[in-house]
Amino acid sequence: MKVLLCWSSYFDVTEFDPQNKHMDPNQRPNVELAATQHRELVDIYDQLGLDVYLAPPVSKLVDMVFTANLGVIIGNKVLMSNFTPMRRREESEYFASFLRKLGYLPYHLPQGIFFEGAGDAIVFGDKILCGYGFRTSKRALAYIEHLMDREVIPLQLQYPGGGKRILYHLDTAGIFMEDAETVILYPGALTKESLRRLEKVANIISASYEDANNLALNAVVVPKTEIWGHFDKVKNEKASLAHFALGMWPELRGVVVTSGLASQDLKKKIEKCKYMPVTVDLGEFLKSGGGAFCLTKIL
């Protein structure tokens, strides 16, 4: 399993965002603590046996650490993002150039059709689950379906109401376990029609708004088939424990890398799906509304 991350050297919160209420320039992240948290995430991936690629950061692109948003990838084709926030729009050309060097073929949407990568387009078996309504235009879905030659399941995101924060990307609303055909989802993130549509292709386990708001649903699923190594040769304690558990309990499907703020209830639901939760403190990135999945582009 190949993953692309970007060093957090220039990560910052420099403005308010009308949709992402986590962002407050009066509560900016601690750069050194963010780097430590990001380093642990990289180490866990590396010691689980994943192929980790690291993109060098660009000083003025303070959000590019959230590599999941760069586009959607199937095979060697990449449909690059058209970001809604102005501050992120230069990321697309940078990552397109970076991915070309890795052998990928970048494609671009017409101007005015917004799309924010794996934040909203999540590969799920032979389909693509695609959120729209806040950061991704509904018109983008037809382009994704045509280019990737996969059925796209349109899922409209909605205001959850009751003073709750908007879950502006699909990846903030659920953990998508394609091999288990299961999604652990905060159902209030989707319209009723979209929820019914998702129920036709996945088993849905309800999660709390609190776990969604803490970005604990913004998690990376690592199947057992992608994990390599042995627990006694791994230095990171969490990765070592994962290797040990997978060796002891063959029925486990893999691990789910999630936030250290994940509730006990959520951890039990992950375990019920035969995955082991591996938690990482990513509190500095929560200040920008991001979690483990946002920080990780699965190649």
Segments predicted by a language model, with ranges:
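The feature marks the mature, well-folded catalytic cores of soluble enzymes
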Residues: 1-299
